[in-house]
Amino acid sequence: SQAIQLGSYNMEARNDAYFWRGESYYRMGEYENAISDYRTYLNNTRQRNTDMYALAYYNLGYSYFKLRDYSAALNRFRQYVDLESNRQAASLADAYNRIGDCLYPNRQFSLAEENYSRAVQLSPSAGDYSIYQKGFLLGLQKDYKGKISAMDRLISEYPESQYVDDALFEKGRSYVLLENSSSAAQAFEKLIREFPQSSLARKAGIQLGLLYYNDNQPEKALAAYKQVISNYPGSEEAKIALQDLKSVYIDLN
């Protein structure tokens, strides 16, 4: 801030100070103030071939993104990817993911998919998010087989990913929609077995009970519901399982 007050002393130092103050505001979650400072920096700096200039667009994109102003965020991320000279930069792959995320609420699915694909190409080691999102978008377009193959790719190529439990759940749901109950059950069972602490394991237990019930396997349905009740006492899913359990018993009698 001192450099900003002494602005006439050195214009470029003053402009850089706006960038750094914008950074501070961003880290504190004061996104409107961050936007104001980044924009002041971008409008006034004469040094436009620098890493800092490109990064300001990236940070500005994130500030808008945090405020859910996706169209403004989209424009800034696109400006950043045009300006970034280092094609290996982790922030470049990340920006393509965010571009995909900005296009998704406007239902521009194929464009979003393209950007997720670019992110995977640029940074294969961090491609799990991009592949998950691509699969999710395929599901929204009712391409359930495409979605399953994306989820399978994530599970096999990124076994340590934080998205593996999500991928198994979405895979199971896709098989349900394809009316392939045995493959759906396998996906849900694997999720429950390998990620018992995941909130999705509870949901998978309910799905499993329903699958077995609809598949005329009441004994297996009862076992699935009982497992949810005993493993996750007090949860919302345990309450649902108890209701469903009663319904199965009524049907059996």
Question: Where does each model-flagged region fall?
Answer:
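Acidic, polar-rich low-complexity tracts and alpha-helical solenoid repeat scaffolds
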Residues: S1-N253
